[in-house]
């Protein structure tokens, strides 16, 4: 198994749902990054882990990979039951809204 394949397996195994309570300490240290639904969360995590800076910079420039705004953070705090799909790529915590039935095949 190549290093890339091993990374993919490790990240897949650690990816899962989280609530605001779990995200809160990471929000406090400004480590949470929102991955837009049009990007596969796993592919974004791999790009960060493998330091694909040009690719990630493009996502940042397009707004598909960004920090949550103050308004989003406040809204999230009020939505205690809400869940996101999350994967940790130190020092970042990447989050994405769970896929809906219509786009479940494009997730991960």
Predicted regions and their residues:
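Acidic-enriched, low-complexity/disordered segments with a strong bias for Aspartate over Glutamate
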Residues: 28-30, 51, 57, 97, ...
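Generic secondary-structure microfeatures
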Residues: 37-39, 60-64, 91-93
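Short, compact, well-ordered microdomains
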Residues: 67-108
């Amino acid at each position: 198994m190549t290093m890339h394949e091993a990374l993919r397996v490790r990240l897949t195994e650690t990816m899962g749902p989280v609530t605001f309570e779990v995200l809160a300490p990471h929000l406090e240290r400004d480590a949470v990054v929102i991955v837009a639904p049009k990007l596969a969360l796993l592919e974004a995590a791999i790009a960060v882990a493998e330091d694909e800076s040009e690719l990630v910079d493009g996502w940042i420039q397009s707004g598909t990979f960004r920090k949550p705004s103050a308004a989003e953070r406040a809204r999230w705090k009020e939505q205690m039951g809400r869940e996101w799909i999350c994967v940790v790529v130190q020092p970042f915590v990447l989050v994405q809204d769970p896929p809906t039935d219509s786009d479940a095949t494009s997730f991960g």
